[in-house]
């Protein structure tokens, strides 16, 4: 079978990076991905800049409930309806505490173990969780340029202008012959 093209968002971006340590891929798209250096810097930044959001997200990751406004603040820069937020919130589930620790410090991806395929690294100007500076750091780590979408937040694929990053991914796949 042909090697896959991986598209990973946030934690899924870390999964894609870990996959590359032991598997081949035809291409990888990292969208607002946890950086290869881990969550530590992003978590500290969020704790200092928006401590209420950080506290609520920790509760949510542990299976607790949070106000929809917290979800809106953490994920979106563009207007989003309460109905959409409620629908997405219902689909959320607790995260693995081990996975969070692994992404923070203990099991980070090692570039030396990877055979790097073509990579596209995307981020959002108003990302509260993985700021553009972290996305740019990820891109530099892999020797590519980050592409930051203005006026968008962490939930790139759910924002009102989701077609902009989706279109860029489609264009990139074509450029790579994928």
Task: Label each PLM-derived region with a short phrase.
Residues 24-59, 99-106:
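Flexible "cap/lid" loop of the alpha/beta hydrolase fold
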Residues 115, 121-123, 127:
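Short beta-strand/loop motif that positions the catalytic acidic residue
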Residues 128-137:
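Conserved alpha/beta-hydrolase "acid-adjacent" motif
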Residues 145-178:
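Catalytic active-site module of serine/aspartate enzymes centered on a nucleophile-bearing elbow/loop
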Residues 64-100:
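Conserved alpha/beta-hydrolase catalytic His-Asp/Glu region
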Residues 6-8, 31, 122:
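Short beta-strand immediately N-terminal to the catalytic nucleophile in serine-hydrolase-like folds
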Residues 7-12, 16:
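Gly/Ala-rich beta-loop-alpha elbow adjacent to hydrolase catalytic centers
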Residues 91-116:
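Active-site nucleophile elbow and catalytic-triad environment of alpha/beta-hydrolase enzymes
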């Amino acid at each position: 079978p042909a090697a896959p093209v991986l598209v990973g968002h946030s934690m899924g971006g870390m999964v894609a990076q870990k996959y590359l340590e032991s598997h081949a891929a035809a291409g990888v798209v990292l969208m607002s991905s946890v950086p290869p250096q881990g969550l530590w810097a992003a978590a500290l930044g969020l704790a200092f800049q928006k401590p209420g959001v950080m506290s609520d997200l920790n509760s949510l990751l542990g299976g607790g409930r949070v106000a929809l406004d917290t979800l809106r603040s953490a994920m979106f820069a563009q207007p989003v309806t309460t109905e959409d937020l409620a629908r997405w919130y219902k689909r959320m589930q607790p995260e693995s505490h081990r996975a969070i620790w692994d992404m923070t410090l203990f099991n980070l991806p090692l570039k030396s173990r990877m055979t790097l395929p073509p990579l596209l690294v995307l981020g959002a100007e108003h990302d509260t969780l993985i700021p553009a500076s972290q996305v740019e750091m990820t891109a530099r780590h892999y020797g590519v340029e980050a592409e930051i979408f203005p006026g968008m937040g962490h939930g790139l694929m759910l924002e009102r202008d989701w077609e902009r990053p989706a279109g860029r991914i489609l264009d990139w796949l074509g450029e790579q012959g994928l």
